[in-house]
Amino acid sequence: MTSALENYINRTVAVITSDGRMIVGTLKGFDQTINLILDESHERVFSSSQGVEQVVLGLYIVRGDNVAVIGEIDEETDSALDLGNIRAEPLNSVAH
C-alpha cells in the first residue's frame, strides 16, 4: 500500500503542527511515522495586529508526532496572496 503523501513529493505543502505553527515548503521525503523533510521552507507567523511574518527555515525536518495537518498548496493562488495585509489570530495548540 502506498502512502497518500507520495503524491506530494516535490510539491509545495503546508504543514500545521500540533503546537499551532504553519510551515510551508517542498516535501522531499517522509517515513512511516510521518517525519517530514521540507526544503526551501518557511514558517508563517500570524498576528491580529500586523501582517503575516515569514521566517526562513530552509531545509527542515518536522517530527511526525508534531504533524496535525498536511495539504498541498496551489502555488499560483499562494503567490497572489498579499501576506503583508493578512491579519489572523495565531492557531492554538492541539488539545488531546
Swiss-Prot record:
GO terms for cellular component: Lsm2-8 complex; nucleoplasm; nucleus; precatalytic spliceosome; U2-type precatalytic spliceosome; U4/U6 x U5 tri-snRNP complex; U6 snRNP. It is found in: Nucleus. Residues 1-76 form the Sm domain. GO terms for biological process: mRNA splicing, via spliceosome. One of its GO terms (molecular function) is RNA binding. It holds the Pfam family LSM. This is U6 snRNA-associated Sm-like protein LSm8. Keywords: Acetylation, mRNA processing, mRNA splicing, Nucleus, Ribonucleoprotein, RNA-binding, Spliceosome. Belongs to the snRNP Sm proteins family. It comes from the Eukaryota. InterPro entries: Lsm8 (IPR034103), LSM_dom_sf (IPR010920), PTHR15588 (IPR044642), Sm (IPR047575), Sm_dom_euk/arc (IPR001163).
